Amino acid sequence: MYVLKNGQVLNASGELENKDVLIQNGKVNLIADSIEVTSGEEFDATGKLIAPGFIDVHVHLREPGGEHKETILTGTQAAARGGYTTICSMPNTKPVPDSKEVMENLQAKIKETAEVRVLPYASITTSLGTDELVDFEALKEAGAFAFTDDGVGVQLAGTMYEAMKRAAALDMAIVAHCEDNSLIYGGVVHDGIFAEKEGLKGIPNIAESVQIARDVLLAEAAGCHYHVCHISTKESVRVVRDAKRAGIRVTAEVSPHHLILDEEAIPGNDGNWKMNPPLRSKADRAALLEGLLDGTIDFIATDHAPHAAEEKNVPMEQAAFGIVGLETGFPLLYTHFVKTNEWTLKQLIDWMTVKPAECFKLPYGKLEEGSVADIVVLDLEKEATIDPATFYSKGKNTPFVGETCIGWPVATFAEGTLVYNEGEIK
């Protein structure tokens, strides 16, 4: 049992109120002006924000098969440090969770080693990236969170349509990395001014937006919940906005780096700036910010994609796609958008908690009496510099190295257990 003393919580109007929070048996038992108990442990939250633990539906944990990049343990330690209490792990592992047996083995490993809640995706196709569909029903029974071939787009419309019909019958979501392989052209960055300046092959906007346009029509026909991963282009935002207006059940996420950076920020041919989707144009970034504010884009997800140093500290042509994000998500977004008065604190917290929970019908993301005690304590005055040497993640690959941010998680409770406190994993 814990009593979080002298903290602040956000009320429904987005105003800060001074409150104590009592955690008992893994639940939020009481939220009150003052709580006095004779047993349990007192946690000093003076001057700090007590918020729901963050939810990230797009995380690469790499295990099994990629343990040199990340493990379930190190990835969930990174999540705890970043204030995330629920993360959803992508299936581009070896082996791929494309069968009941592999999924059950993965669930057992998660139960054994994870510091926070991990909800694993199953792949849409066998081995991921093929045209043979998995056994959707068996994988749901084995505990799959949803279905995705993240890392590649499902290339054939017929394959995607059949997948959507099967997912809809089970009331499960299809989560899509949207990329038409015939439009990538071997690109490593956005097809724009940086690619032209550096003489690099570019990935055009239409590689993403064309597949989203196809898929929203398939989702409408199948009656499926279709979720767009890491949306990055103005055309994609337009397609999703129009689909929502038409009543199609489509949701979308955006990554912090696509909100903060664009291609003009890239300093040179450095693999640590290579990600998929790539950093787009200023106009694309503006469209993403507008789409998030008007509800076209539903929430924020990091697309935490750790790699070994030798896979990133090379030119873009040789580097792996992806950057880490779990340990920097909140500080970056708070510094760039809340401190600058572009967003309210409540908007940011909602996009990292209740919004993803609502989209995927998760019973998390709220701080209220009776809720699961997934809690992050945030010091909104704490100033620190992003230093990959301090990361719990094995991946140190971030373009934000050396950036000073204000507002950091200082403690994380997962189902009432203190898993991170003042720089230490418990």
From Swiss-Prot:
The prosthetic group or cofactor this protein requires is: Zn(2+)
Q: Which residues bind substrate?
A: 60-62, 92, 276, 307, 321-322
Which reaction is the catalytic activity of this chain?
(S)-dihydroorotate + H2O = N-carbamoyl-L-aspartate + H(+)
A single GO molecular function term of this UniProt record: dihydroorotase activity
GO terms classed as biological process: 'de novo' UMP biosynthetic process; purine nucleobase catabolic process
GO CC terms of this entry = cytoplasm
Which pathway or pathways does this protein act in? Answer: Pyrimidine metabolism; UMP biosynthesis via de novo pathway; (S)-dihydroorotate from bicarbonate: step 3/3
Task: Tell whether Hydrolase is among the UniProt keywords.
Answer: yes
Q: Which UniProt keywords apply?
A: Hydrolase, Metal-binding, Pyrimidine biosynthesis, Zinc
Which top-rank group of organisms is this from? Bacteria
Query: What EC number(s) does its UniProt record assign?
Result: 3.5.2.3
Q: What protein name does the entry list?
A: Dihydroorotase
What organism does the record attribute this protein to? Listeria monocytogenes serotype 4a (strain HCC23)
Q: What is the lineage of its organism?
A: Bacteria, Bacillati, Bacillota, Bacilli, Bacillales
